[in-house]
């Protein structure tokens, strides 16, 4: 009985550490996938890259990453209505949504091209990857 009561706290601590490691590992994999998709998308020169989208990256400095990812995912979801739905945009949307708030405000007035939007998102994700 004495040995079991000593093992329980140790096992709980190990379980907590393992789940933190797995979450961090999955997070890095998601960021790597996003960067890979962004590299592929920004190398393309099709008409979809010239679409005008909201510039969600002009948000105030104190905006959280989850809020920025939510806004970026919202922009990507809106692109689907322009017949630009390809597997990389869908995958990018799915991965960003998994890292984002469920809802967010979209008050941006400034606009940019989809290509510029994706380039800026790539820089943000690369910084996040190297920080993490």
Swiss-Prot record:
- An example molecular function term from Gene Ontology annotations: cytokine activity
Q: What is its main location?
A: secreted
GO terms classed as biological process = B cell activation; immune response; interleukin-4-mediated signaling pathway; negative regulation of apoptotic process; negative regulation of inflammatory response; negative regulation of osteoclast differentiation; positive regulation of B cell proliferation; positive regulation of DNA-templated transcription
Intrachain disulfide bonds: 48-84, 70-104
**Signal sequence segment:** 1-24
Which key words are in the record? Answer: B-cell activation, Cytokine, Disulfide bond, Glycoprotein, Growth factor, Secreted, Signal
So which residues have sugars stuck on them? 28, 45, 62, 83, 95, 101
Instruction: Tell me the compartments it is located in.
Output: Secreted
Q: Provide a GO CC annotation, any one.
A: extracellular space
- What does it do? Participates in at least several B-cell activation processes as well as of other cell types. It is a costimulator of DNA-synthesis. It induces the expression of class II MHC molecules on resting B-cells. It enhances both secretion and cell surface expression of IgE and IgG1. It also regulates the expression of the low affinity Fc receptor for IgE (CD23) on both lymphocytes and monocytes. Positively regulates IL31RA expression in macrophages. Stimulates autophagy in dendritic cells by interfering with mTORC1 signaling and through the induction of RUFY4.
Report the protein name in the record.
Interleukin-4
Which source organism?
Answer: Canis lupus familiaris (Dog)
As recorded in Swiss-Prot or TrEMBL, the protein's gene is named IL4
């Amino acid at each position: 009985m004495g040995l079991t009561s000593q093992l329980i706290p140790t096992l709980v601590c190990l379980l907590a550490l393992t789940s933190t490691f797995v979450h961090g590992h999955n997070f890095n994999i998601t960021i790597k996938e996003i960067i890979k998709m962004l590299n592929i998308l920004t190398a393309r020169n099709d008409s979809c890259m010239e679409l005008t989208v909201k510039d969600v990256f002009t948000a105030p400095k104190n905006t959280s990453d989850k809020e920025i990812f939510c806004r970026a995912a919202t922009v990507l979801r809106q692109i689907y209505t322009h017949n630009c739905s390809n597997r990389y945009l869908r995958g990018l949307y799915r991965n960003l949504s998994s890292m984002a708030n469920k809802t967010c405000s979209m008050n941006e007035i400034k606009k940019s091209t989809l290509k510029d939007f994706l380039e800026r998102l790539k820089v943000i994700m690369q910084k996040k990857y190297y920080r993490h």
